[in-house]
UniProtKB/Swiss-Prot annotation:
Organism: Zea mays
All copies of domain GS beta-grasp, residue ranges: 19-99
EC annotation from Swiss-Prot or TrEMBL: 6.3.1.2
Reactions it catalyzes: L-glutamate + NH4(+) + ATP = L-glutamine + ADP + phosphate + H(+)
Subunit structure comment from the entry: Homooctamer.
Subcellular location: Cytoplasm
Family statement: Belongs to the glutamine synthetase family.
GO cellular component, one term: cytoplasm
Domain (GS catalytic) ranges: 106-355
Listed GO biological process terms: glutamine biosynthetic process
Keywords associated with the record: ATP-binding, Cytoplasm, Ligase, Nucleotide-binding
GO molecular function, one term: ATP binding
Protein name in UniProt: Glutamine synthetase root isozyme 4
Main location: cytoplasm
Length: 355
């Protein structure tokens, strides 16, 4: 007799050409991912060949009840690591029935920036270091922490191994492999400084695809933690006190920065970021003031700074200085930042904006 797991793992390709497409979108809070599935007559690899769909925006905080229809536009396709076969995950953005982007659709304006000739010519690359914290479902307390208590001080947990130092590795490894299967350019994972906190990296990715990949990687992580009965939080400072917060350091380069003499281009770009520090901070994630305190490997939120290999700076430059070209790392974005907003804003400030 078949058990539930057997049915969940049924291979549809043996009996039908039809596939399941899971449409994913961002809800009204700007961080809540939503999804629903539909049957399609056969495999699809081009998002422009996928049908648009709709949903009840009044149930996601994105439309009033008397005019609640929101339209999903498919934008990027990934292989589905949960259903496998020819089934797909579809990253969408959201529009009114008249075709106008709704206010929470940050992808639309990001895509306009990335498709502008000036930005496209520079082919901006991104590597995003997404930190997150795993919480016990019933207590909302970090995984591996004693209920109502605290583990030993930070030090042994970063990239640590062992049952007393590493909590949730099965979830992390499942997520790593699922992202690779899906076609996300996930480039690594590691345990973080605070116990129960982890990081995965996505990139290098070009332009708008960086945001698509980070959002779908987040979606896959939330689905895996759902299966595991664990809660994932992207809060930038989940535990107050002498514990590291969670960020989404954004590594960035342009064609000009990657060429000989690129270090001068990088320094000019950093100067532009300094001039627009307040605007960037306002767009870099909610609650970031709890994280950017000048302690725990962060810069103070009110002061812009940069340096070579300086983990306490707003922007860090590594081997780039010695090589004379390369990339830099914007360390200000919080773990709950919108990658569409952050990536496009960095490109706009450093390539398009004139002081």
């Amino acid at each position: 007799m078949a058990c539930l797991t057997d049915l969940v793992n049924l291979n549809l390709s043996d009996t039908t050409e039809k596939i399941i497409a899971e449409y994913i979108w961002i809800g009204g809070s700007g961080m809540d991912l939503r999804s629903k599935a539909r049957t399609l007559p056969g495999p699809v690899t081009d998002p422009s060949k996928l049908p648009k769909w709709n949903y009840d925006g009044s149930s996601t905080g994105q439309a009033p009840g008397e005019d609640s229809e929101v339209i999903l536009y498919p934008q990027a396709i990934f292989k589905d690591p949960f259903r496998r076969g020819n089934n797909i995950l579809v990253m969408c953005d959201c529009y009114t029935p008249a075709g106008e982007p709704i206010p929470t659709n940050k992808r639309y304006s990001a895509a306009k920036i990335f498709s502008s000739p000036e930005v496209a010519a520079e082919e901006p690359w991104y590597g995003i270091e997404q930190e997150y914290t795993l919480l016990q479902k019933d207590t909302n307390w970090p995984l591996g922490w004693p209920i109502g208590g605290f583990p030993g001080p930070q030090g042994p947990y970063y990239c640590g191994i062992g049952a007393e130092k590493s909590f949730g590795r099965d979830i992390v490894d499942a997520h790593y492999k699922a992202c690779l299967y899906a076609g996300i350019n996930i480039s690594g994972i590691n345990g973080e400084v605070m116990p129960g906190q982890w990081e995965f990296q996505v990139g290098p990715s070009v332009g708008i695809s960086s945001g698509d990949q980070v959002w779908v990687a987040r979606y896959i992580l939330e689905r895996i933690t759902e299966i595991a009965g664990v809660v994932v939080t992207f809060d930038p400072k989940p535990i107050p006190g002498d514990w590291n917060g969670a960020g989404a350091h954004t590594n960035y380069s342009t064609e000009s920065m990657r060429k000989e003499g690129g270090y001068e281009v990088i320094k000019a770009a950093i100067e532009k970021l300094k001039l627009r520090h307040k605007e960037h901070i306002a767009a870099y994630g909610e609650g970031n003031e709890r994280r950017l305190t000048g302690r725990h490997e962060t810069a103070d939120i009110n002061t812009f700074s940069w340096g070579v290999a300086n983990r306490g700076a707003s922007v860090a430059v590594g081997q780039t200085e010695q090589n004379g070209k390369g990339y830099f790392e914007d360390r200000r974005p919080a773990s709950n930042m919108d990658p569409y907003v952050v990536t496009s804003m960095i490109a706009e400030t450093t390539i398009v904006w004139k002081p």
